[in-house]
Amino acid sequence: MKDIATPNRTKDIVEKYGFSFKKSLGQNFLIDTNVLNRIVDYAEIGPKGGAIEIGPGIGALTEQLAKRAKKVVAFEIDQRLLPILDETLAPYDNVTIINKDVLKANVHEVFQEQFEEGQDVMVVANLPYYVTTPILFKLLEEKLPVRGFVVMMQKEVGDRLAAKPGTKDYGSLSIAIQYYTEVETVMTVPRTVFVPQPNVDSSVIRLLKRPKPIVEVIDEKFFFEVVRASFAQRRKTLMNNLSNNLNDFPKDKELLERILTEIGIDPKRRGETLSIEEFAMLSNALVPHKMK
């Protein structure tokens, strides 16, 4: 049987079921088998491994994962795709489709039901553009026992994930993702290999979970509050941003300035110039003065 991800087969499937693409669900189907195979290559899933997919569409990536993994679990929010997936994935008995919004699903429960204890599992997905960040954060914050992620996303978002301090793309998203994972941009995917064609190119990003976060922080929740406050207005200094936007800290500019100076951070610097290590040092220095 021909692979799903060819222009003709995709067209035939879509026409057979009278399927109309929903822009609100960010539906863009990949029609290039080479790209799909490279994505699966980067995930390095062995014959005993597992994969979690989000938004399988008509099953193009699911099919390639099913050929290599022992078990594939895919979350699909759109009920209209279920009969299509029943047909396209019929040759594979190692795939389970879950008709749920992954953001509302109990992913831990699904994980325990579907995978063996200690099984090597990767999240591999062409993520819908409009929910890329919430999905990544949900799966990272819930500490799902996966090795990592190989995910396709809007190139602009991928650039932000991998950004270094002092660059225009560096922000709270870069820090949050790099706190939990090692980030690598493994390929760029042109918009021309999708149906319908999106307005922008995509990136495939590999995120490998760190055994423990890259920096040690006393209070993780407060660390992220400090990071978010520091980027609240990019043109403002660290001093201004923290004094105006850090809600859990006393409105005391002198105290703030003294702490910054003591740890060797110039209060006139901007948030985007600080490394993740400097943010950890800063939040740890501010914690004792935090309002309870």
Curated annotation (Swiss-Prot):
Enzyme category, top tier: transferase
Residues holding S-adenosyl-L-methionine: 28, 30, 55, 76, 101, 126
This protein's UniProt keywords: Cytoplasm, Methyltransferase, RNA-binding, rRNA processing, S-adenosyl-L-methionine, Transferase
Alphabetized SMART domains for the sequence: rADc
EC number: 2.1.1.182
Source taxon at top rank: Bacteria
Matching InterPro entries: KsgA/Erm (IPR001737), rRNA_Ade_diMease-like_C (IPR023165), rRNA_Ade_Mease_Trfase_CS (IPR020596), rRNA_Ade_methylase_Trfase_N (IPR020598), rRNA_adenine_dimethylase (IPR011530), SAM-dependent_MTases_sf (IPR029063)
Record localization: Cytoplasm
Swiss-Prot/TrEMBL catalytic activity: adenosine(1518)/adenosine(1519) in 16S rRNA + 4 S-adenosyl-L-methionine = N(6)-dimethyladenosine(1518)/N(6)-dimethyladenosine(1519) in 16S rRNA + 4 S-adenosyl-L-homocysteine + 4 H(+)
Signal sequence interval, chain numbering: none
Family statement drawn from the similarity comment of this UniProt entry: Belongs to the class I-like SAM-binding methyltransferase superfamily. rRNA adenine N(6)-methyltransferase family. RsmA subfamily.
Protein name: Ribosomal RNA small subunit methyltransferase A
